[in-house]
């Protein structure tokens, strides 16, 4: 191709990449909901787990502590932070131990008489009002006077204070200066976010809002704000993963460039060989944006990792070029084998699509499209752009010696049997369980952070994130009624110290029938005014001071019962909304549990309710979900393996040749499993993903080592290309193996071991007839 035509082709290719980049920039919406990478639930508990793992009330809680100043200063900071956060629509509840006059939306204040349990045992008559007013008189001479002055005219019986106490955590920390403190002299706060716990992006915004509000407070410069909770953990994990992936990516990229420059001594070839990889990435993302409304961030991260297979295509072309030979001639000779490798890798990645998990389906689409684009652009576009004059790598002195050493290696036929026996022994002697079902074991969070969370959770009486009490009824009101009926049994369990506290939906909203019953006990305006006038006799209050109270009671008499829908318009009602779930024609109520000491007692509570109440162990549900997930992936892998055998056998037209390709790949895969298990590593889903990637790389090695042209120079070129591929893979994944993030470490270690084992076994099990040079 003439120089002008080459420049035109390069410009068209670059314009196509720019167009793909524009499409991606316009359409790409990145999702951070981790549930996209979980399988579809099959049991009621799994469905509830998936719904509540990020949206449940416990997952939305942020635990805050402020330290580093005097108690008085910390109390002031606590009050200032709470005041700044309460009007913010990103938070549904902010608690710090102080009385919250605004806990109920102002428009809902008259409902306090329907929400409070006072009228269940005490009528609003003269005797009760007189007793309450005398108590308020005493209160006005106490330190609480400043708080009560604004409240007294509208609420002389302090129903709002009673509700605030009811809605506070059952196990509240010590109060100092009117706010919560820990035994370590930290001011404590509980904040519930609107954002789901497993939405790191929205949680980051909520956390940023808290930190900005805190740093804007006077006197905050010398104090330290610490956060904890599921949402905070999701943000920390995401930040740690990005940080480690970024620095590993930078170092490995620099190393990869240096490796290619050392291998080919051509900067132009290096730049041009990047075009198929860039095309693969942009085309894969563009197709994702067309096929899916949102693309998960993990899909992009894993997808770029899996596209590491595609970097081998231009490397093979560069290494196999002969001096004076046109690049088109080189690629034509390689294409049948490259096409087999591409098709085989695509079949392996189809296992992700067959898993049925949305995140893995995205991963399959991304990688398969990317591999096809990288492969075909390497075949039909790249050769026209490569420099015409190249150095034949087969003439390198070190490579001649390396190939001679490889040729002299013993290749006894019993190697496969020996490796298989070693695998069996290692698997038999491996300690601990084979599979890792506990997702918590994959957390990269430091122990100190987890201990800090446990300490704050205990001090604040925050709900347990493992257990939920699930109530089931045919209607929403049925759930609230069941919740109310269950309360005496819960109180008995608390008295027996089986549990510290259980927060039920009726805790926030009584059923309609209970509200109507209380409403009927409210006196009419004339009766209330008469009783109030009598109660005021002899007390120093103005006669008209309590007219707002009289008006609220009159308003409450005519109010329709408060429903969850209307309640949800207030911040506190959004907390109730998180505790009520409609599914499959019935309603569920979710009770959060704090300080569970006797699991059996709570399970017995469920057994006595004819199935309407049950204790949900989210850990057990997640483990069953992971096991089901793994089963589906393994089934998909089995089908993909069978297709792979058929594809390789068809492409090579020989069972013997197929054996030389598939046997080392299979043995190397199981050898990685055996070594990791012998080291005590439990196999997780991420190890399976890494094994598939390593298998795709190993398939390339075996295919090209099996290709015996009878030409020693071509054998050296094959060895050169494979060594460059192996070193580049070890560079990237070896770095990942040193990461502190368990997921990254699992992928890095597994692929690094896989690359090493695949390379060695592909050489030792390749057909070998040494051809002497003339």
Segments and roles (model prediction):
Residues 1-32, 383-384, 388-438:
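Signature of alpha-helical transmembrane segments and their immediate interfacial
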Residues 22-23, 76-187, 497-575:
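Alpha-helical transmembrane helix bundles of large polytopic membrane transport and channel proteins
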Residues 23-69, 168-176, 411-414, 432-474, ...:
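Solvent-exposed, non-transmembrane loop/terminal regulatory segments of multi-pass membrane proteins
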Residues 146-262, 266, 554-644:
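Extracytoplasmic
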Residues 270-316, 657-702, 734:
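Hydrophobic transmembrane alpha-helices and their membrane-interface caps
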Residues 274, 324-355, 711-740:
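Pore- and gate-forming transmembrane helices of large, multi-pass membrane proteins
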Residues 290, 306-322, 335, 339-343, ...:
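Transmembrane alpha-helices and their membrane-interface boundaries in multi-pass membrane transporters
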Residues 414-538:
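Juxtamembrane segments of multi-pass membrane proteins
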């Amino acid at each position: 191709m003439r120089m002008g035509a080459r420049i035109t082709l390069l410009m068209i290719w670059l314009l196509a990449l720019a167009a793909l980049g524009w499409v991606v920039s316009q359409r790409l919406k990145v999702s951070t909901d981790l549930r996209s990478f979980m399988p579809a639930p099959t049991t009621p508990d799994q469905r509830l787990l998936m719904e509540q793992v990020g949206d449940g009330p416990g997952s939305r809680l942020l635990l805050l502590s402020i330290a580093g100043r005097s108690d008085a200063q910390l109390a002031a900071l606590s009050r200032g932070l709470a005041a700044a956060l309460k009007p913010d629509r990103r938070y549904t509840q902010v608690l710090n131990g102080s009385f919250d006059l605004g806990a109920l939306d102002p428009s809902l204040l008259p409902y306090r008489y329907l929400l409070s349990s006072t009228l269940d045992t005490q009528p609003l008559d003269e005797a009760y009002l007189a007793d309450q007013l005398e108590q308020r008189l005493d209160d006005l001479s106490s330190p609480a006077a400043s708080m009560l002055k604004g409240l007294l005219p509208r609420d002389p019986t302090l129903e709002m204070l009673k509700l605030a106490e009811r809605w506070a955590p059952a196990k509240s920390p010590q109060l100092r200066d009117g706010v919560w403190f820990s035994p370590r002299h930290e001011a404590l706060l509980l904040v519930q976010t609107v954002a789901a716990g497993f939405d790191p992006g929205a949680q980051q915004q909520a956390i940023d809002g808290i930190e900005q509000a805190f740093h804007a407070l006077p006197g905050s410069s010398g104090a330290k704000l610490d956060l904890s909770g599921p949402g905070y953990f999701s943000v920390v994990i995401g930040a740690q993963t990005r940080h480690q992936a970024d620095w590993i990516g930078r170092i490995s990229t620099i190393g990869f460039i240096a490796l290619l420059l050392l291998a080919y001594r051509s900067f132009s070839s290096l730049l041009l060989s990047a075009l198929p990889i860039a095309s693969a990435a942009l085309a894969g993302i563009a197709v994702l944006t067309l096929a899916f409304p949102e693309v998960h961030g993990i899909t992009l991260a894993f997808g770029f990792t899996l596209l590491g297979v595609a970097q081998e295509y231009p490397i093979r072309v560069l290494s196999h070029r002969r001096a004076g030979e046109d690049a088109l001639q080189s690629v034509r000779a390689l294409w049948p084998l490259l096409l087999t490798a591409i098709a085989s890798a695509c079949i392996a990645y189809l296992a992700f699509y067959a898993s049925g998990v949305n995140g893995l389906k995205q991963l399959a689409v991304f990688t398969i499209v990317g591999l096809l684009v990288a492969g075909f652009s390497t075949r039909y576009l790249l050769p026209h752009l490569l420099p015409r004059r190249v150095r034949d790598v087969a003439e390198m002195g070190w490579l001649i010696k390396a190939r001679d050493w490889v040729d002299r290696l013993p290749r006894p036929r019993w190697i496969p049997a020996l490796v298989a026996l070693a695998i069996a022994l290692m698997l038999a002697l491996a300690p601990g369980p084979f599979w890792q079902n506990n997702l918590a074991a994959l957390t990269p969070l430091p122990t100190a952070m987890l201990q800090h969370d446990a300490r704050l959770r205990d001090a604040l009486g925050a709900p347990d994130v493992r257990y939920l009490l699930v109530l089931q009824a045919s209607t929403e009101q049925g759930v609230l009624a069941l919740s109310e009926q269950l309360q005496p049994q819960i109180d008995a369990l608390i008295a027996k110290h089986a549990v510290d506290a259980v927060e039920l939906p009726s805790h926030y909203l009584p059923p309609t029938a209970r509200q109507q019953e209380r409403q009927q006990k409210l006196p009419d305006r004339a009766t209330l005014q008469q009783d109030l006038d009598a109660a005021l006799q002899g007390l120093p209050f103005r006669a008209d001071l309590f007219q707002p109270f009289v008006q609220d009671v009159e308003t409450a008499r005519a109010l329709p019962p408060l429903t969850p829908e209307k309640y949800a318009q207030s911040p506190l009602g959004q907390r109730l909304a998180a505790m009520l779930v409609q599914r499959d024609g019935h309603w569920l109520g979710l009770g959060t549990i704090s300080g569970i000491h006797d699991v059996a007692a709570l399970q017995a509570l469920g057994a006595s309710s004819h199935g309407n109440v049950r204790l949900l162990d989210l850990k057990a549900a997640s483990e069953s979900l992971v096991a089901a997930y793994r089963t589906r992936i393994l089934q998909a892998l089995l089908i993909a393996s069978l297709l792979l055998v058929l594809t390789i056998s068809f492409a090579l037209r020989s069972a013997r040749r197929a054996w030389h390709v598939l046997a080392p790949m299979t043995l190397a895969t199981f050898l990685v499993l055996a070594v990791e298990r012998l080291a005590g590593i439990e196999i997780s889903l991420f190890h399976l993903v890494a094994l598939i990637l390593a298998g795709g790389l190993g398939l390339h090695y075996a295919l090209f080592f099996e290709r015996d042209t009878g030409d020693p120079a071509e054998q050296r070129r094959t060895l050169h290309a494979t060594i460059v591929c192996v070193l580049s893979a070890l560079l990237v994944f070896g770095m990942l193996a040193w990461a502190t993030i368990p997921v990254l470490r699992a992928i890095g270690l597994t692929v690094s071991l896989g690359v090493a084992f695949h390379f060695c076994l592909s050489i030792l099990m390749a057909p070998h007839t040494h051809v002497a040079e003339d």
